[in-house]
Amino acid sequence: MNHKLCCIGYITRDKIVTPGNTVYMPGGTAFYFAKAVSRLQAENFLLVTALAEEDRAAADDITNEGIEVKLVPTAHSHSFENIYGDNPNDRSQRVTAQADPFCIEDLKDVQADIIHLGTLLADDFSLEVIKHLASKSTLAADVQGFLRKVENEKVYPVDWAEKKEALKYIHTLKANESEMEVLTGCSEPHEAALLIADWGVKTVLLTLGDKGSLIYSGGQFYDIPAYPTLQVVDATGCGDTYMAGYLYKRSQGASYEEAGCFAAAMCTIKLQSHGPFNGTEEAINAILSGVKH
C-alpha cells in the first residue's frame, strides 16, 4: 500500500530532567512525530519504528490512537537521558542503550509519497538505506542524528562525513542553530541555507528557537515567526513536532510559508506542556489568526 506520509525512526526510552522536574516517558522523533500526526486530520500515515520486545507498549499506544505502525525487531531500544538548564534551547544528553540500525530488508515494503527520516544517532540510517528510500519516495530528514556521536554514553556533536553524498538524496532537511553550524561551519542562517542547498537539498528548514525559523526553497527565503508562549514547560520533541506539522501541510498542498507557520504554531502549543503535541487544528488555527490561546 502506498501511504501519503511516513516517518521512519526509533521510539526511545527517555528520562527528561528540567530544573523543576524529572519525567520518564517514551520519546524520539518517531514518537513525537506520530503523536503529533495523530492529533491532525492526517490520513494514510505510516510509522515505521524499532523497539525491544519489552518496550513495545509504546508502539501499541500509538496504534490505539489510529496510527498504522510497522514494528521492526531490535535487541535493544534507544535509551536517552535529556537534561535541560534554565534555557530550554540548551540540552545535554546521555545514551544508555542503542538499537540496531535500520536496513534495506526492514524497509523494502515501505511505500510513501513522503518519507521522513527521524534520525537520532549517526548509525540509524546508512547511505545505502538513504539511496534505497530516495529511489521510491521524496525524502525528508532531521539532521540531528547524523551529527551525534556516542562515546561512553555521552553524545558529542560531529560533522557528517558522508553529507555531500547523502544530501543529494534528501529533498527536505531540518536543522536547528547549533546543528546548522556543525553541518556548514556557518553561524548566519541565510548563508548556511544556501550552502546546504548547494549540496543538493531542495528545501532547507532552519529552526532558530524563539527567533522563529527560516525556510529556503526554489531560490527564495521565507521567514517564519515564533508565536509567543504563555510558558515554556518542555522543549523535548519540538523539532519533531515542527516537521510533523510542516510535512503534513505540504502533503496537503500548502505553500512553504503556510506550512512553516502551521508548524510554528504547533510548536507554541507543544512547548507549554510535558510530552508530545496534544493540541488540535482548531487551536493551531486560532494562534495563526491571532486569537489568544
Task: Specify the residue positions occupied by each region the protein language model found.
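Conserved N-terminal subdomain of the carbohydrate kinase-like
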Residues: 2, 13-24, 39-118, 123, ...
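Structural detector of well-ordered beta-strand residues that form the stable sheet scaffold
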Residues: 6, 139-142, 205
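Active-site metal-binding loops of divalent metal-dependent hydrolases
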Residues: 10-11, 29, 241
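Short glycine-enriched, charge-decorated loop/helix-capping segments at active-site entrances
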Residues: 20-25, 153-156, 230
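Histidine-anchored nucleotide/phosphate-binding helix
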Residues: 28-39
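Short, conserved phosphate/pyrophosphate- and ester-handling motifs at nucleotide-, phospho-/glycolipid
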Residues: 37, 176, 239
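Conserved beta-alpha-beta core of the PfkB/ribokinase-like small-molecule kinase fold
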Residues: 118-194
